[in-house]
């Protein structure tokens, strides 16, 4: 130390500045190199995952060649997988992620690293329980979703049309891989119940019933007519439509028929309609679903306790509202009549109504389309189709004007699908230019939980459009609470069936306590939840996580809490598992 004592202060100051400059430069270079190395890893991971099948690639990227990705031969892939290989690969990814100097990563990359670590750790935990995976199902199964995904396959170039036609020829080998998987499940005592089988077969038979008037032909012709890159002549359109119809007759319909026949041959080899709890490893698999789909890692007992508390809270609020106004239900019935806006007008109103609670978007262009008449019975009242990540357009909301919902319910649905729901959340997240892997590795609990959370705001906004907003406010609040209670009840039943081992009788007793006695209604609720484990919790447990996170932030910040800024932070972080979201909200 004495050596430096005699150095003039000015020189010492210059030396220190010089030393700091060098060290900062070295550190900066190291920071950059570590972030660059991490980004190279995520880009490589994205390219690997996005090319798994043609549908994933096409729906994710409009121009894969601009990212150095060569389109592989058009294929739907296979339903078969090697659990040991998958586990090993996930563990390798986890090991590589842990090799990065975490403290030297930017906050954005640390967040991505946390999300990926949890994602691959969770996937690796599945192991042999992957045998309980079920690709088929009456509502959400592959055989139900595939025609819709094919029908909505965007034609941007002539190559897209060529790929689409090739995909039709791969439906049969893809379904054959599912048949092989189902035979393996049958041999292991894991095949579906005859009740579920009947529901799937009914759908397959419906699809093949009128081969000469299949709705996919109509939609293909409609898309060809609209294609302009460059446009086809009438003669070329006719030739392509003829070829398409031939593929439907010789490839797609036979594939569905073969699937139906093969499944029928396995009738009786499955157990009666029961939840996952009745299968070996079923409870562990259900926990895996909660983690991988819902993004929650809290004990099941804690989830049940929170659900029960919310159910009681909603019930008490409903009772209080009815006590204040015994004619509230009559007022609610009037509300739907007063909300006379068209879907287009509803979507135009929502961005303006939500300004006080949610950040305004820079650009929120979208298209509103009507579901093709032949697809109405298969689809929900409305749904949002996400755009490719490299174009971010078009943002498309489909309206199914089948008349199955009231105007108030439709308004809530459009808030869920549009503003401030899925469309708004997707566009908000994209404005931050996240890494591509964030679009592939996501969290359904965040995505559906957010849309359900903001749906409650949608109901509130609807009240402001009524003839008498003040009296409508409580009536519309009643409607939301009723919806919340239904979702909560179904979520508790989901846990009861798949984790606690409830059978149909036990489920009926539970529903009876809430005044649901109709035998066919009870049977339908039970069967749907048996076939879709964890599905309701993606929506409702996700919703409660956002609700609770808001309460935590309100308590911590007190008068400094700003609802719009709270929402902005959630949107900036984007879809991640809830432990990761909570970490970065602090």
What are these regions (language model features)?
Residues 7-586:
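N-terminal maturation segment of proteins
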Residues 1-7:
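N-terminal Lys/Arg-rich, disordered targeting/topogenic segments
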């Amino acid at each position: 130390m004495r050596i430096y004592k005699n150095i003039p202060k000015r020189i010492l100051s210059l030396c220190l500045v010089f030393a700091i400059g060098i060290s900062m430069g070295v550190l900066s270079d190291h920071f950059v190199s570590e972030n660059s190395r991490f980004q190279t890893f995520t880009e490589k991971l994205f390219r690997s995952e996005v090319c798994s099948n043609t549908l994933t690639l096409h729906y994710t990227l409009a121009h894969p060649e601009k990212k150095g990705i060569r389109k592989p031969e058009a294929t739907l892939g296979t339903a078969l997988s090697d659990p040991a290989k998958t586990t090993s690969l996930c563990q390798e990814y986890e090991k590589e992620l842990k090799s990065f100097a975490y403290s030297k990563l930017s906050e954005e990359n640390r967040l991505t690293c946390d999300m990926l670590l949890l994602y691959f750790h969770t996937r690796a935990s599945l192991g042999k329980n992957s045998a309980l995976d079920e690709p088929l199902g009456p509502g959400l199964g592959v055989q139900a979703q595939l025609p819709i995904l094919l029908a909505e396959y965007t034609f941007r170039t002539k190559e897209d049309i060529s790929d689409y036609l090739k995909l039709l020829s791969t439906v049969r080998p893809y379904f054959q891989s599912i048949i092989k998987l189902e035979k393996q499940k049958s041999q292991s005592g894991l095949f579906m119940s005859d009740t579920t089988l009947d529901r799937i077969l009914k759908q397959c038979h419906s699809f093949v019933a009128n081969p000469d008037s299949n709705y996919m032909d109509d939609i293909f012709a409609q898309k060809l007519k609209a294609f302009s890159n460059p446009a086809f002549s009438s003669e070329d359109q006719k030739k392509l439509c003829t070829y398409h119809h031939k593929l439907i007759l010789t490839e797609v319909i036979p594939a569905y028929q073969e699937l139906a026949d093969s499944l029928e041959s396995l009738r009786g080899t499955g157990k009666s309609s029961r939840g996952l709890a009745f299968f070996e490893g079923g409870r562990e698999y259900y926990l895996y679903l909660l983690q991988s789909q819902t993004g929650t890692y809290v004990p099941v007992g804690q989830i049940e306790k929170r659900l029960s508390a919310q159910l009681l809270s909603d019930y008490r609020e409903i009772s209080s509202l009815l006590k204040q106004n015994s004619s509230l239900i009559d007022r609610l019935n009037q509300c739907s009549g007063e909300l006379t806006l068209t879907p287009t007008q509803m979507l135009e109103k929502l961005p303006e109504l939500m300004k006080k609670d949610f950040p305004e978007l820079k650009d929120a262009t979208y298209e509103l389309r009507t579901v093709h008449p032949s697809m109405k019975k298969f689809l929900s009242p409305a749904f949002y189709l996400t755009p490719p990540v490299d174009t971010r357009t078009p943002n498309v909301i489909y309206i199914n004007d089948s008349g199955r919902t009231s105007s108030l319910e439709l308004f809530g649905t459009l808030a869920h699908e549009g503003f401030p729901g899925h469309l708004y959340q997707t566009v908000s997240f994209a404005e931050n230019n996240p890494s591509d892997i964030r679009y592939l590795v996501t969290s359904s609990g965040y995505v559906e939980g957010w849309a359900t959370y903001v749906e409650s705001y949608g109901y509130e906004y609807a009240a402001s459009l009524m003839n008498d907003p003040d009296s409508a406010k409580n009536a519309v609040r009643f409607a939301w609470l009723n919806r919340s209670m239904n979702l909560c009840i179904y979520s508790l039943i989901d846990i009861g069936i798949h984790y606690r081992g409830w059978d149909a009788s036990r489920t009926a007793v539970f529903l009876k306590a809430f005044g649901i006695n109709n035998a066919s209604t009870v049977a339908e609720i039970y069967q749907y939840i048996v076939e879709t484990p964890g599905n309701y919790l993606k929506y409702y447990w996700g919703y409660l996580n956002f609700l609770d996170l808001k309460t935590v932030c309100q308590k911590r910040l007190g008068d400094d809490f700003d609802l719009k800024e709270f929402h902005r932070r959630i949107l900036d972080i984007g879809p991640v598992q809830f432990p990761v979201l909570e970490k970065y909200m602090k």
